[in-house]
Amino acid sequence: MLCDPVSYTDRPSILSSTSLQEGTLTLLHVETDMDMPFIFESLKKESAKNWDIQPLLDNFKKSFSYIAGSHTSQAFIVKLNGLPIFEIEAHEGPKHAPLHSGFQAADGDYFIIMIAGHFDQAAFSVYISSLQFCLEYFFRYPEVKRIIAPVYDGSDREQRAQLLIQTGLKGFLEKTTPTEPDLFTIYRP
Protein backbone atom coordinates (compact mmCIF):
# COMPACT_ATOMS: atom_id res chain seq x y z
CA MET A 1 0.00 0.00 0.00
CA LEU A 2 1.23 3.49 -0.82
CA CYS A 3 0.70 4.76 2.73
CA ASP A 4 2.02 1.77 4.68
CA PRO A 5 3.99 2.71 7.80
CA VAL A 6 7.73 3.07 7.38
CA SER A 7 10.28 1.60 9.75
CA TYR A 8 13.78 2.98 9.43
CA THR A 9 16.87 0.97 10.11
CA ASP A 10 19.81 3.16 9.08
CA ARG A 11 18.80 5.10 5.98
CA PRO A 12 15.66 4.93 3.89
CA SER A 13 16.01 2.80 0.80
CA ILE A 14 15.50 4.23 -2.66
CA LEU A 15 11.90 3.52 -3.68
CA SER A 16 12.40 4.44 -7.31
CA SER A 17 14.97 6.12 -9.52
CA THR A 18 15.31 7.36 -13.07
CA SER A 19 17.90 9.13 -15.18
CA LEU A 20 17.42 12.62 -16.54
CA GLN A 21 19.78 14.67 -18.65
CA GLU A 22 20.54 16.64 -15.46
CA GLY A 23 21.37 13.53 -13.43
CA THR A 24 19.78 10.78 -11.35
CA LEU A 25 16.39 11.39 -9.78
CA THR A 26 15.50 9.33 -6.68
CA LEU A 27 12.37 8.99 -4.56
CA LEU A 28 12.76 8.05 -0.89
CA HIS A 29 10.79 8.26 2.33
CA VAL A 30 11.68 11.34 4.37
CA GLU A 31 14.58 10.70 6.72
CA THR A 32 13.94 13.16 9.53
CA ASP A 33 17.43 14.12 10.69
CA MET A 34 18.82 14.46 7.19
CA ASP A 35 15.85 15.88 5.25
CA MET A 36 14.12 18.08 7.83
CA PRO A 37 16.43 21.11 7.49
CA PHE A 38 15.78 21.17 3.72
CA ILE A 39 12.01 20.80 4.18
CA PHE A 40 11.94 23.48 6.84
CA GLU A 41 13.96 25.91 4.70
CA SER A 42 11.56 25.26 1.82
CA LEU A 43 8.58 25.99 4.07
CA LYS A 44 10.32 29.11 5.28
CA LYS A 45 10.72 30.31 1.68
CA GLU A 46 7.08 29.56 0.96
CA SER A 47 5.92 31.51 4.00
CA ALA A 48 8.34 34.42 3.53
CA LYS A 49 8.70 34.73 7.30
CA ASN A 50 11.83 34.65 9.41
CA TRP A 51 11.07 31.81 11.76
CA ASP A 52 13.25 30.63 14.60
CA ILE A 53 14.28 27.31 13.10
CA GLN A 54 15.18 25.07 16.07
CA PRO A 55 11.86 24.83 17.98
CA LEU A 56 9.91 24.42 14.76
CA LEU A 57 12.39 21.88 13.41
CA ASP A 58 11.82 19.73 16.51
CA ASN A 59 8.04 19.88 15.98
CA PHE A 60 8.39 19.06 12.28
CA LYS A 61 10.49 16.00 13.15
CA LYS A 62 7.72 14.76 15.44
CA SER A 63 5.13 15.41 12.75
CA PHE A 64 7.07 13.52 10.09
CA SER A 65 7.75 10.67 12.51
CA TYR A 66 3.98 10.43 13.00
CA ILE A 67 3.41 10.39 9.22
CA ALA A 68 6.03 7.64 8.85
CA GLY A 69 3.96 5.43 11.17
CA SER A 70 0.63 6.33 9.58
CA HIS A 71 -1.59 4.02 7.54
CA THR A 72 -3.26 6.93 5.72
CA SER A 73 -0.41 9.35 4.90
CA GLN A 74 3.19 9.15 3.79
CA ALA A 75 5.98 11.67 3.15
CA PHE A 76 8.55 11.34 0.38
CA ILE A 77 11.60 13.31 -0.66
CA VAL A 78 12.73 13.73 -4.26
CA LYS A 79 16.46 14.12 -4.83
CA LEU A 80 18.51 15.02 -7.88
CA ASN A 81 22.04 13.62 -7.70
CA GLY A 82 21.55 13.04 -3.96
CA LEU A 83 20.41 16.60 -3.18
CA PRO A 84 16.78 17.25 -2.17
CA ILE A 85 14.66 19.31 -4.54
CA PHE A 86 11.21 18.88 -2.95
CA GLU A 87 9.15 16.99 -0.41
CA ILE A 88 5.82 15.47 -1.41
CA GLU A 89 3.17 13.95 0.83
CA ALA A 90 0.44 11.52 -0.17
CA HIS A 91 -2.74 11.36 1.93
CA GLU A 92 -5.65 8.95 1.56
CA GLY A 93 -8.48 11.24 0.45
CA PRO A 94 -11.44 9.94 2.49
CA LYS A 95 -9.35 9.92 5.70
CA HIS A 96 -7.81 13.37 5.14
CA ALA A 97 -9.39 16.63 6.25
CA PRO A 98 -11.57 18.13 3.52
CA LEU A 99 -9.67 20.66 1.40
CA HIS A 100 -12.63 22.20 -0.39
CA SER A 101 -16.28 22.70 0.55
CA GLY A 102 -17.46 21.54 -2.89
CA PHE A 103 -15.54 18.27 -2.93
CA GLN A 104 -15.91 14.96 -1.12
CA ALA A 105 -13.07 12.47 -1.59
CA ALA A 106 -13.96 8.92 -2.63
CA ASP A 107 -12.16 5.60 -2.20
CA GLY A 108 -9.09 5.63 -4.42
CA ASP A 109 -8.60 9.41 -4.14
CA TYR A 110 -5.22 10.56 -2.83
CA PHE A 111 -4.22 14.14 -2.08
CA ILE A 112 -0.66 15.21 -2.73
CA ILE A 113 0.96 18.19 -1.07
CA MET A 114 4.28 19.44 -2.38
CA ILE A 115 6.78 21.56 -0.44
CA ALA A 116 9.28 23.08 -2.86
CA GLY A 117 10.24 26.53 -1.59
CA HIS A 118 10.57 28.79 -4.60
CA PHE A 119 11.39 26.01 -7.07
CA ASP A 120 14.99 27.18 -6.91
CA GLN A 121 16.82 23.87 -6.46
CA ALA A 122 16.78 22.92 -10.16
CA ALA A 123 15.46 24.01 -13.55
CA PHE A 124 11.66 24.12 -13.75
CA SER A 125 11.75 21.29 -16.32
CA VAL A 126 13.35 19.09 -13.63
CA TYR A 127 10.38 19.79 -11.32
CA ILE A 128 8.01 18.77 -14.12
CA SER A 129 9.94 15.52 -14.73
CA SER A 130 10.17 14.92 -10.98
CA LEU A 131 6.45 15.32 -10.37
CA GLN A 132 5.69 13.02 -13.33
CA PHE A 133 8.13 10.53 -11.80
CA CYS A 134 6.25 10.72 -8.45
CA LEU A 135 2.85 10.29 -10.10
CA GLU A 136 4.09 7.22 -11.98
CA TYR A 137 5.34 5.76 -8.69
CA PHE A 138 2.07 6.52 -6.86
CA PHE A 139 -0.04 4.99 -9.65
CA ARG A 140 1.90 1.72 -9.32
CA TYR A 141 -0.28 1.09 -6.30
CA PRO A 142 -3.65 -0.36 -7.36
CA GLU A 143 -5.54 1.46 -4.60
CA VAL A 144 -4.60 4.84 -6.13
CA LYS A 145 -7.25 5.72 -8.72
CA ARG A 146 -7.04 9.51 -8.73
CA ILE A 147 -4.57 12.08 -7.43
CA ILE A 148 -5.74 15.50 -6.31
CA ALA A 149 -3.41 18.45 -5.75
CA PRO A 150 -4.43 21.70 -4.04
CA VAL A 151 -3.04 25.09 -5.06
CA TYR A 152 -3.41 27.78 -2.41
CA ASP A 153 -2.96 31.53 -2.76
CA GLY A 154 0.63 32.68 -2.49
CA SER A 155 3.45 34.26 -4.42
CA ASP A 156 4.12 31.02 -6.33
CA ARG A 157 0.46 30.17 -7.04
CA GLU A 158 0.77 30.54 -10.83
CA GLN A 159 4.03 28.60 -10.89
CA ARG A 160 2.47 25.72 -8.92
CA ALA A 161 -0.59 25.68 -11.17
CA GLN A 162 1.66 25.62 -14.26
CA LEU A 163 3.70 22.77 -12.78
CA LEU A 164 0.56 20.70 -12.24
CA ILE A 165 -0.83 21.48 -15.70
CA GLN A 166 2.47 20.71 -17.44
CA THR A 167 2.63 17.45 -15.49
CA GLY A 168 -0.77 16.41 -16.81
CA LEU A 169 -3.18 17.41 -14.04
CA LYS A 170 -6.34 19.29 -14.93
CA GLY A 171 -8.05 22.00 -12.91
CA PHE A 172 -11.46 20.76 -11.78
CA LEU A 173 -12.64 22.86 -8.86
CA GLU A 174 -11.89 26.51 -8.13
CA LYS A 175 -11.92 27.93 -4.63
CA THR A 176 -15.12 29.42 -3.30
CA THR A 177 -13.63 31.05 -0.18
CA PRO A 178 -10.29 32.82 0.37
CA THR A 179 -8.91 29.95 2.45
CA GLU A 180 -9.80 27.16 0.03
CA PRO A 181 -7.44 25.96 -2.68
CA ASP A 182 -8.09 25.39 -6.34
CA LEU A 183 -8.02 21.63 -6.95
CA PHE A 184 -6.25 19.85 -9.80
CA THR A 185 -6.62 16.16 -10.59
CA ILE A 186 -5.30 13.30 -12.66
CA TYR A 187 -6.78 9.81 -13.00
CA ARG A 188 -4.93 6.52 -13.24
CA PRO A 189 -3.72 6.15 -16.84
PLM regions and their residue ranges:
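An amphipathic alpha-helix signature
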Residues: 33-40, 61, 65
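Alpha-helix boundary/capping residues
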Residues: 43-46, 67, 167
